[in-house]
Each structure stands twice: as C-alpha cells, then as structure tokens.
C-alpha cells in the first residue's frame, strides 16, 4: 500500500515548469497510490470554485482522471486556496477534509494539516486568517464578479510579498509549544504538515513520549513528495524535466 502527501505546489499559469512536474506526478506516481493527500496551497491563489479558466480546468481534469482510476484523493485548504470548496471537490471527486484531521495509516493515528495554524508567533497573520475564514465574508466575496476578485487577489498578493520581506524566518515557522499542544489534544505522536517550505523530519520527546513532525517541501524548484510504503515514511524530490 502506498500513500502520498504533497503541499505547497503554488500552481499558477506563470510557472509552467511546476504544472508540468505536477501533471507528470499525477500520471506516473499518484496513479499507483491508494491515497493522495494534498495539504494545502495547491494553487498560488484560488479565487473561487467558479473559476473555469483553461488553467483551472487542466488541474481539475488531472484530479478527475486520478479519482476515476480509483485513487482516493483528499484536500485540506491552505492559506492560498482556502476558497477551494465543495464545488471543486464534487467536480473532481476529491474529499475535502477539516483543517486538522486525524487519519489512520496502518492502524496508526496521524494528524495532518496545512500548518499555518501552528505559526502562532505571527500574530498579524493569525488575525488576518481569522478574518478571511469568516463564512459571511467568504459568502460575500464569492458573489463578487470573477474579474473583480482577480484584481482584489492581485493586490493582496503584492501586500503579502511586501510584508514577508519584513518578517523574520523564526516568526514564519511553527511554534513548538503549539505543535506539542495540538498533538496532545488530538492524541497523536505523528504530525504531517506543509506551509513552512522547510522539508524535514523532527523528533522530540514530550512527557517521555516520542513524537515526530514531518514537514513537506514546496515545489518551487523541484517536486516534493512524502511517501508511505512498507511501514516507512520517506521524503522524496522529483526533478523538473
């Protein structure tokens, strides 16, 4: 049994090399898996499930093809695609999961998430996140004409890039105490997440319990895939062709 985990692809029309790598992954690796988990930021930005552009259709078709072949696909919203919702999932056969979800992997409880909720030292981001996740605000935004939403998102992108330049690397990483709190709350000793773009496996001890946190990588310069096979988790890279 093979299970695959990916995140932080940031797919967009202006980075065709990432899209090509992703489509190759779907056709040659994902097709042989039992399950595929996408832990957020599949897209650079997702402005709504009514986006029927040729680019979004290309990505939708890749998932539809995969799910039609019997691969179970799951998605957790990231900070760039939190508007990806039920319509997209219905069209593609993907199952939308809660922000924090515990799954069963060969009898072992594993907590999966995007990871942005763990970065609690970034207070301004957490305040922004709380605002944009309000259902009433999303309801209003989704009813704004698509071309206006595109303009709004472009302005938000520019502001995010500007603010990031003034943030320290530490404030954009997870807060260890929050990691431990959430893992204890969910009753797990293994956590898998993305968001920070710092692929690694972290081991630590809490109250004599061995804990593990696996961080997925981004797809800016190569693909990053976490595989589970033969009772082992392995972080792999996939080169751009």
UniProtKB/Swiss-Prot annotation:
<feature type="binding site">
    <location>
        <position position="164"/>
    </location>
    <ligand>
        <name>substrate</name>
    </ligand>
</feature>
<feature type="binding site">
    <location>
        <position position="122"/>
    </location>
    <ligand>
        <name>substrate</name>
    </ligand>
</feature>
<comment type="pathway">
    <text>Glycolipid biosynthesis; lipid IV(A) biosynthesis; lipid IV(A) from (3R)-3-hydroxytetradecanoyl-[acyl-carrier-protein] and UDP-N-acetyl-alpha-D-glucosamine: step 4/6.</text>
</comment>
<dbReference type="InterPro" id="IPR029052">
    <property type="entry name" value="Metallo-depent_PP-like"/>
</dbReference>
<keyword id="KW-0464">Manganese</keyword>
<keyword id="KW-0378">Hydrolase</keyword>
<feature type="binding site">
    <location>
        <begin position="79"/>
        <end position="80"/>
    </location>
    <ligand>
        <name>substrate</name>
    </ligand>
</feature>
<feature type="binding site">
    <location>
        <position position="197"/>
    </location>
    <ligand>
        <name>Mn(2+) 1</name>
    </ligand>
</feature>
<feature type="binding site">
    <location>
        <position position="8"/>
    </location>
    <ligand>
        <name>Mn(2+) 1</name>
    </ligand>
</feature>
<feature type="binding site">
    <location>
        <position position="114"/>
    </location>
    <ligand>
        <name>Mn(2+) 2</name>
    </ligand>
</feature>
<dbReference type="Pfam" id="PF00149">
    <property type="entry name" value="Metallophos"/>
</dbReference>
<dbReference type="GO" id="GO:0009245">
    <property type="term" value="P:lipid A biosynthetic process"/>
</dbReference>
<keyword id="KW-0444">Lipid biosynthesis</keyword>
<feature type="binding site">
    <location>
        <position position="41"/>
    </location>
    <ligand>
        <name>Mn(2+) 1</name>
    </ligand>
</feature>
<keyword id="KW-0441">Lipid A biosynthesis</keyword>
<keyword id="KW-0472">Membrane</keyword>
<feature type="binding site">
    <location>
        <position position="167"/>
    </location>
    <ligand>
        <name>substrate</name>
    </ligand>
</feature>
<feature type="binding site">
    <location>
        <position position="41"/>
    </location>
    <ligand>
        <name>Mn(2+) 2</name>
    </ligand>
</feature>
<keyword id="KW-0997">Cell inner membrane</keyword>
<keyword id="KW-1003">Cell membrane</keyword>
<protein>
    <recommendedName>
        <fullName>UDP-2,3-diacylglucosamine hydrolase</fullName>
        <ecNumber>3.6.1.54</ecNumber>
    </recommendedName>
</protein>
<feature type="binding site">
    <location>
        <position position="195"/>
    </location>
    <ligand>
        <name>substrate</name>
    </ligand>
</feature>
<dbReference type="GO" id="GO:0008758">
    <property type="term" value="F:UDP-2,3-diacylglucosamine hydrolase activity"/>
</dbReference>
<dbReference type="GO" id="GO:0019897">
    <property type="term" value="C:extrinsic component of plasma membrane"/>
</dbReference>
<keyword id="KW-0479">Metal-binding</keyword>
<dbReference type="GO" id="GO:0005737">
    <property type="term" value="C:cytoplasm"/>
</dbReference>
<comment type="function">
    <text>Hydrolyzes the pyrophosphate bond of UDP-2,3-diacylglucosamine to yield 2,3-diacylglucosamine 1-phosphate (lipid X) and UMP by catalyzing the attack of water at the alpha-P atom. Involved in the biosynthesis of lipid A, a phosphorylated glycolipid that anchors the lipopolysaccharide to the outer membrane of the cell.</text>
</comment>
<dbReference type="InterPro" id="IPR010138">
    <property type="entry name" value="UDP-diacylglucosamine_Hdrlase"/>
</dbReference>
<feature type="binding site">
    <location>
        <position position="79"/>
    </location>
    <ligand>
        <name>Mn(2+) 2</name>
    </ligand>
</feature>
<dbReference type="GO" id="GO:0030145">
    <property type="term" value="F:manganese ion binding"/>
</dbReference>
<dbReference type="InterPro" id="IPR004843">
    <property type="entry name" value="Calcineurin-like_PHP_ApaH"/>
</dbReference>
<dbReference type="InterPro" id="IPR043461">
    <property type="entry name" value="LpxH-like"/>
</dbReference>
<comment type="similarity">
    <text>Belongs to the LpxH family.</text>
</comment>
<feature type="binding site">
    <location>
        <position position="10"/>
    </location>
    <ligand>
        <name>Mn(2+) 1</name>
    </ligand>
</feature>
<feature type="binding site">
    <location>
        <position position="195"/>
    </location>
    <ligand>
        <name>Mn(2+) 2</name>
    </ligand>
</feature>
<keyword id="KW-0443">Lipid metabolism</keyword>
